[in-house]
A protein has these predicted regions:
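Glycine/proline-enriched, intrinsically flexible loops and inter-domain linkers
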Residues: 210-302
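Acidic, Ser/Thr/Pro
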Residues: 1-219
Length: 302
């Protein structure tokens, strides 16, 4: 079976191979990074995280879908401005730093025994029972169904108020990287579902790496020029060092981070500047040439 585990970005602090149909739990410190990889592609994974300091006080506050979707205005946060997952206390727990798939699920529970029983598969192993088993040692109460981030699930809103699910778009070696915004207690599954298309009808392993915060990951989506092309991560342009000081609102434009607007200016002022003053626009996504060198200013003023 074809499988890819991409090389570490730098030395990981921990590596966990989550065998198919099982789960594992682990803890990370604030600022650390969590990389969840689908080595064979099309294998889905449920991710849960709790604020460790609150758990130590007997309070369970995990990632919450509704709070996240409300604050982010997106069905699933992604790298950039709208990147955070929140708990019910409105505190951010993780930030999405890199995402090479971009399609995940924040509507459904991690799979449950009831899901399989309703389909006629009594006693089928499921993610919720697996999470109950591995999270219990950290004092997290058992649940019939877990509110998880369902990574790599191809879920969307359909017509007539339906929620649709199909085979994952993830390819071998695809991954998501989170940055912990608190000390976190986490759980990750390798989904065991073999009765529908979510895992390509064939459950496989999930691989997790954690990295300490000594280095910083660049924020990136994956961009493919064609369906069979190798993925390329979003890049900063030659102007990013300056524009990043003027705004946090960047969008992915054909593989480059471009400013969407500038803080404290607004659409009207920007429009007026285009008509009445001079503006510099970053057109790197159009593959324009960058002008560099000691005489660059003279050339631009020519």
């Amino acid at each position: 079976e074809f499988s890819i585990i991409p090389d570490p970005v730098y030395d990981p602090s921990n590596e966990i191979n989550i065998v198919k149909t099982t789960a594992n739990s682990y803890q990370v410190k604030e600022g650390d990074y969590i990389q969840v990889i689908t080595p064979t592609g099309r294998q889905c994974s449920d991710f849960v995280a709790y604020d460790t300091s609150k758990l130590d006080k007997g309070k369970e506050n995990g990632l919450d879908w509704q709070t996240t979707r409300t604050f982010m205005g997106h069905t699933f946060p992604g790298p950039g401005l709208f990147s955070k997952f929140y708990d019910v206390d409105h505190e951010p727990l993780v930030e999405v730093v890199r995402d090479t798939v971009g399609i995940h699920d924040t509507f459904n529970l991690a799979c449950t025994s009831k899901y399989y029983e309703d389909a006629g598969y009594f006693g089928h192993i499921n993610c919720s029972d697996n999470l109950n088993e591995v999270m219990e040692k950290y004092g997290v109460q058992k649940k019939k169904g877990w509110h998880a981030i369902n990574l790599f699930f191809n879920t969307s809103a359909g017509g007539q108020n339906s929620v649709l699910s199909d085979e994952s778009y993830a390819r071998p070696g695809d991954y998501v990287i989170f940055r912990a915004l608190k000390d976190l207690t986490c759980g990750t599954t390798a989904c065991p579902s073999d009765i529908d298309s979510c895992n390509g009808w064939n459950p496989t392993d999930i691989f997790v790496r954690t990295y300490d915060k000594k280095k910083e990951f660049t924020k990136s989506f994956a961009f493919r020029m064609k369906t069979d092309s190798e993925k390329k991560l979003t890049r900063n342009t030659g102007f990013y060092e300056r524009t990043s000081k003027l705004t946090r609102n960047f969008i992915d434009a054909r593989g480059f981070w471009l400013p969407n607007d500038y803080t404290k200016h607004g659409v009207i002022n920007e429009y007026t500047a285009c008509r009445e003053k001079a503006v510099v626009i970053d057109l790197s996504s159009l593959r324009k040439f960058e002008i560099i060198g000691p005489d660059a200013e003279e050339l631009m003023n020519y």
